[in-house]
Every structure is written in C-alpha cells, then in structure tokens.
C-alpha cells in the first residue's frame, strides 16, 4: 500500500479460482487480457488485491501454473491471512485481531464429532481456519448443529459453505468481507481512501465482499448458484452490483467499463497498426510493444514490413540491448532478426506478458521502466528482470523511442538459449 502517495484511483479485489482465473480457458486469454489492461493503465496509481480461499501453499502453486500478475495485497485462507507485496509480508495486526474468542483446538475437537465432515489436506488447515469437505445434502444440518455446539463452548465463529462442498470454520471477525473492510479502514486512517473499489467473485465465500458499503461489484457470468441466490435475497436491485455476461477476468473488464471506472479496452484487443497517442504513457508503450512481439511470433499479425518498421520506429538507431548473458547487441539488429522468427510459435501455447511494471522519470522527457518479462510455452517458463529507457519524442511516428534495454534472468527461470530472450 505504500507505493501510492495518495488515494488509489481504483482498487480491484478479486477472487481467483473461476473469477480472475478461468480453469476452462486453456490459453488463459481473459487472464492475459486483464493483465495487459492493468499493467498498461492502472498499475501505477491503483491497487490489485487477490482474495482467495486458497492457503499460501496452494496460492503459490496457482501462480506457477497461470500467467497471473503480482498483486499489491493478498488475502488468503478465506480472509484469515493478509499479506503485502511480492514478499508477502504478513499483517500482524490482523492476526492479533482474529484471536478474539477463537480456540483452534476446541474447533478441532468439536468437528471431530461429525462423521459427515472430511478434513481437507493439511496445507489448507491454517491458524485461523479449519477446513472440511461435506456433502451438499448434509451441509445445512451440519452447519446448524455445529453453530450451536461452538456457541456452547464460548467460541464466536463463522461457518462458510461454498463451492457445493467446502466448509470453512473461521473466527467471527474473519472472512473476505471483514478483511477488505479492515484494509479500507487502514487506507482511510492513512488519509488514502480509494476513489473506487470493485469487488469480483463467483461463489458463496465471495458474498461478503459485495456487502461492504460503497463498493461496486461484479458476479462473473459463471457465478455459482449459492452466490446468485445470495444476490437475489440480499442485493437485487442494487445498481452497484451486476451479473456480467462474460466469464471470469473478461467479466471483470466488462464491469470496469459498465461502471465507468476507467479505460476498459485491453492492449491485447487493440489491432495493429496502433494509433499514435496524444499523450504517451510509458506503461502502455511497453505493454503494447510485447503484445505485438508475441503476436508476431504467433503469426497473429500479417507478415508485413510495416510491423518490422514499427519496431524500428520505436527503437533508437544507436540503441542497445544487453542480453542476460551480458552480450550487447544493437536494438535495430535485434529488430532485423525478428523477420526470421515470424510465426515460429504459431499453433503453440506461447505467451509473453509483463508484471510488476514500475516507472520513474529520469528527465523532462525520459523514463526508466522496470518490469518482469515473462515468456511461457506449455509448462516451460522464462523470466527476465528488465530495465528499459524510453524517451518521449512527439515528432517521431510513434511518439516515443526506446534507447536502451537491459535484461537479467530471474533466479529459477533462466535459459541457456539466448534466443529465448530476443527483445
């Protein structure tokens, strides 16, 4: 949260499975479309929050499988854990707050009396969360009995049933909604209340998010019956909550446009040739650069000299690129080499995307842009920590020039093949 000097233009708080991440989309197109939009338009003045029922272990596994962005804040284990930044620094104040009227040992003892409850894997058992699988037919009766037993034991707990099988027992003060309320209060106390907040979900454990006063909300088109039922009973007619017509991350993009929260056209949906912008945004320039690079290698743009010429127009004739090995090459020579790799990834599950994009102004018309540049093909992943120097030049065809690129392998994601890191 410290990255912003003032109020966030927009906070997006999204569930992951079947909301931000579409497990039926093998190409991850909607997730990549959202990622390109966020890094292009919002990453410098807004906050991205992932709110998931997953434990830290399963959350990290998902990040290795899908082309997800690095969020500013991560809420995990159904709102019982809050962490900040890439390092996932825990919020100790939140953990201390959840200890009120909570005794995990008593919860375990009481739930052991119900044969209908099957413990979830050990990774999903957390300090402030005990999780089970339970058959849909038995769920409501078990919840009613459990609630009474916990009250008799002097505990104040919350029981959440979602996904038609998952039953989570948490402290009463926990949950996705309370975690978000805590964060919004924290931002307000620092004098940084967000201009707008958009919450996004698909299942029962997301319902609390939509109850926070003042937020906009989107139930993605594939939302489950339990969330739609909650909406019908509690929020029908609320103009700030919509049921999207698009699935998952595409539904989130739809909501940004519907509520007029900001630009809602992803760079991945912009055709080539690009229209010259009146005001150059370094973030937008970088994202579009690598989207076009991917489309060229996948043969999703025509094999035209105009594409190669565009890359030359936006790179300085004397500019250099330093590859991860330390090899220094001419930017224009690297662009020329693109001609030979047109369509080499056609029909393959090849994608490239940028993450953790950070911009600093180095002069009146010059910028230093730092980001993680990811490339994936099937299950194989590569990542370069990339620095790019960019000058705004209104008189040039594109309005800007890239003068220098420096790439270093991210530990654990390197390749011996320097060709894997052409631009």
Swiss-Prot record:
It comes from the Eukaryota. The keyword Hydrolase applies. GO terms for molecular function: magnesium ion binding; sucrose-phosphate phosphatase activity. It is an enzyme of class 3 (hydrolase). InterPro entries: HAD-like_sf, HAD-SF_hydro_IIB, HAD_sf, NTF2-like_dom_sf, SPP-like_dom, SPP_C, Sucrose_Phosphatase, Sucrose_phosphatase_pln/cyn. Belongs to the sucrose phosphatase family. Catalyzes the final step of sucrose synthesis. This is Probable sucrose-phosphatase 1. It comes from Oryza sativa subsp. japonica (Rice). The gene is SPP1.
């Amino acid at each position: 949260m410290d990255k912003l000097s003032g109020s966030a233009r927009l906070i997006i708080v999204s569930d992951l499975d079947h909301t931000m991440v579409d497990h039926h989309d093998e190409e991850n197109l909607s997730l990549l479309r959202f990622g390109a939009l966020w890094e292009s338009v919002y990453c410098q003045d807004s906050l991205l929050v992932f709110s998931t029922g997953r434990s830290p272990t399963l959350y990290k596994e998902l990040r290795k499988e899908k082309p997800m962005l690095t969020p500013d804040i991560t809420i995990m284990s159904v709102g019982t854990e809050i962490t900040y930044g890439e390092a996932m620094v825990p919020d100790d104040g939140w953990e201390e707050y959840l200890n009120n009227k909570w005794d995990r040992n008593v919860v375990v003892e009481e739930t052991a009396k119900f044969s209908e409850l099957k413990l979830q894997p050990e990774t999903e058992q957390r300090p402030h969360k005990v999780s089970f699988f339970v058959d849909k037919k038995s769920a409501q009766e078990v919840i009613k009995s459990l609630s009474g037993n916990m009250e008799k034991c002097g505990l104040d707990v919350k029981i959440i049933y979602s996904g038609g099988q998952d039953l989570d027992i948490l402290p009463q003060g926990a949950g996705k909604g309370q975690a978000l309320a805590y964060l919004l209060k924290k931002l307000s106390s620092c004098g940084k209340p967000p201009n707008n907040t958009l919450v996004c979900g698909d299942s029962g454990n997301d319902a609390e998010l939509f109850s926070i006063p003042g937020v906009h909300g989107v139930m993605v088109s594939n939302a489950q019956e339990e969330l739609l039922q909650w909406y019908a009973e509690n929020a029908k007619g609320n103009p700030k909550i919509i049921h999207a017509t698009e699935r998952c991350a595409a539904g989130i993009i739809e909501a940004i446009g519907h509520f007029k929260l900001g630009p809602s056209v992803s760079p991945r949906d912009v055709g080539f040739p690009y229209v010259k912008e009146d005001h150059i945004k370094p973030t937008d320039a970088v994202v579009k650069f690598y989207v076009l690079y991917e489309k060229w290698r996948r043969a999703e743009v025509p094999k035209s000299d105009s594409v190669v010429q565009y890359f030359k127009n936006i790179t300085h004739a004397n500019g250099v690129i330093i590859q991860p090995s330390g090899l220094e090459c001419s930017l224009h020579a690297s662009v020329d080499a693109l001609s030979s790799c047109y369509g080499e990834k056609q029909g393959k599950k090849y994608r490239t995307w940028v993450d953790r994009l950070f911009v600093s102004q180095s002069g009146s018309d010059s910028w230093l842009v730092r980001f993680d540049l990811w490339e994936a093909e099937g299950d194989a992943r590569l990542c370069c920590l990339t620095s790019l120097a960019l000058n705004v030049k209104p008189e040039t065809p594109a309005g800007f020039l890239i003068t220098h690129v420096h790439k270093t392998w991210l530990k654990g994601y390197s390749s011996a093949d320097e060709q894997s890191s052409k631009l």
